[in-house]
UniProtKB/Swiss-Prot annotation:
Residues 26-40 are cytoplasmic. It is a single-pass type III membrane protein. The lineage of its organism: Eukaryota, Metazoa, Ecdysozoa, Arthropoda, Hexapoda. The keyword Acyltransferase does not apply. It is found in: Endoplasmic reticulum membrane. The keyword Endoplasmic reticulum applies. Component of the oligosaccharyltransferase (OST) complex. One of its GO terms (biological process) is protein N-linked glycosylation. Subunit of the oligosaccharyl transferase (OST) complex that catalyzes the initial transfer of a defined glycan (Glc(3)Man(9)GlcNAc(2) in eukaryotes) from the lipid carrier dolichol-pyrophosphate to an asparagine residue within an Asn-X-Ser/Thr consensus motif in nascent polypeptide chains, the first step in protein N-glycosylation. N-glycosylation occurs cotranslationally and the complex associates with the Sec61 complex at the channel-forming translocon complex that mediates protein translocation across the endoplasmic reticulum (ER). All subunits are required for a maximal enzyme activity. Its main location: endoplasmic reticulum. This is Dolichyl-diphosphooligosaccharide--protein glycosyltransferase subunit 4. Belongs to the OST4 family. It comes from Drosophila mojavensis (Fruit fly).
Length: 40
């Protein structure tokens, strides 16, 4: 079985990964939005 410590580590790693994924998505989305306005 999964211990409490293993579950806590897994949930923390998953949370950090999802947070970084959201930050990367917004960073890429913001940069492509600005460059498309400049090209018009």
């Amino acid at each position: 079985m999964i211990t409490d410590v293993q579950l806590a580590i897994f949930s923390n790693v998953l949370g950090v990964f999802l947070f970084l994924l959201v930050v990367a998505y917004h960073y890429i989305n913001a940069n492509t939005g600005k460059s498309s306005i400049k090209n018009k």
